[in-house]
Regions:
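General small-molecule cofactor/ligand-binding pocket signal
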Residues: 36, 87, 109-113
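Solvent-exposed loop/turn segments at secondary-structure junctions
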Residues: 64-68, 90-94, 116-119, 130-131, ...
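Primarily the HKD phosphodiesterase
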Residues: 47-108
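Signature of lipid phosphatidyltransferase scaffolds
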Residues: 24-26, 125-126, 130-173
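Bacterial N-terminal signal peptides
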Residues: 8-18
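Sec/Tat signal peptide C-region and signal peptidase I cleavage site
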Residues: 20-22
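Positively charged n-region of N-terminal signal peptides that target proteins for export
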Residues: 1-7
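Short N-terminal segments immediately surrounding and downstream of signal-peptide cleavage
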Residues: 24-46
Length: 173
């Protein structure tokens, strides 16, 4: 597959993983889509910015580890009274740091799914917005793409259903 097609192929695969995402149009004229690609921190910054906008909930799933900036944003959201829950995927590639202890010490509910290996769809739901993250095949480059769908409540609901399924499978609830 051509490198330019990989992000689009992942997006299609990720949308199919959500129970009804393929049938959920972005309903609002106010909805927007942003795409961030980088070899530096621009993609992570987009995720941090989205979490910073949270008012009610943040659900994060599919990460083998939580990047420190994202973990700090999750803790800040929790301290503002936002309901924050995380499902991490156990991975031998995560190394010693996963962020789980850091998040748990802030009172964030963290479930670890040891049944699934890499790759897993990585997504963050913030109120009625969704961010989908893909990593480059070149692990050494640490490149990632983040697609952010803002003000997309039906898409967020579809991914929330997937989150709660993953959460239950990981032993949460």
């Amino acid at each position: 597959m051509a490198p330019a097609m990989r992000p689009a192929a992942f997006l299609v695969a990720a949308l199919c993983c959500a129970a009804t995402a393929h049938a959920s149009p972005i309903p609002s004229d106010a909805a927007s889509v942003g795409r961030y690609f980088s070899y530096d921190n621009a993609a992570a910054d987009a995720t941090v910015d989205l979490i910073g906008q949270a008012q009610r909930r943040v659900l994060l799933a599919g990460y083998a580890y939580v990047p420190p900036a994202v973990a700090a944003a999750l803790r800040a959201a929790r301290s503002r009274g936002v309901d924050v829950r995380v499902v991490l995927v156990r991975s031998s590639r995560a190394g010693k740091y996963s962020g789980a202890g850091f998040l748990k010490s802030a009172g964030i509910d963290v479930a670890i799914d040891s049944r699934h290996g890499d790759p897993a769809p990585r997504f963050v739901i913030v109120d009625d917005s969704v961010a989908l993250t893909t990593l480059s095949d070149d692990a050494a480059a640490h490149a990632e793409t983040v697609n952010v769908f803002q003000r997309a409540p039906e898409l967020a609901q579809s991914y929330a259903q997937s989150f709660w399924r993953l959460y239950r499978q990981a032993g949460g609830l």
